[in-house]
């Protein structure tokens, strides 16, 4: 299992260095902004959601709701709510 995790992690790391804004159709974004947003997507993928999460996060040049959900997840916006008390 650890070998599989290592391979997936390695693929994610390689994808960081192998992608530029033009590769996904982002022509109106600076390299610095792209790198920051792309790193957010990769962090979501590292949290166990995988390459599909990274790809969906990058959709529409990071303007899709999926990107915002990823950022919210990283910022722990989604917290578990307390369960209501059991009434007897």
UniProtKB/Swiss-Prot annotation:
GO terms for cellular component: extracellular region. Keywords: Secreted, Signal. It comes from Latrodectus tredecimguttatus (Mediterranean black widow spider). Disulfide bonds: none annotated. Belongs to the arthropod CHH/MIH/GIH/VIH hormone family. Its main location: secreted. Co-purifies with alpha-latrotoxin-Lt1a. Expressed by the venom gland. It is found in: Secreted. This is Alpha-latrotoxin-associated low molecular weight protein. InterPro entries: Crust_neurohorm_sf. The keyword Heme does not apply. May increase the toxicity of alpha-latrotoxin and/or other venom components. Is non-toxic to mice and to the cockroach Periplaneta americana. Residues 1-18 form the signal peptide.
């Amino acid at each position: 299992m650890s070998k599989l995790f290592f391979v997936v992690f390695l693929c994610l790391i390689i994808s960081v260095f192998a992608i530029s804004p033009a590769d996904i159709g982002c022509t109106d974004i600076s390299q610095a902004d792209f790198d920051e947003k792309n790193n957010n997507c990769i962090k979501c993928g590292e949290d166990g959601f995988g390459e599909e999460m990274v790809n969906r996060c990058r959709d529409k040049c990071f303007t899709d709701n999926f990107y915002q959900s990823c950022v919210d997840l990283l910022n722990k916006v989604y917290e578990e709510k307390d369960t209501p008390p059991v009434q007897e």
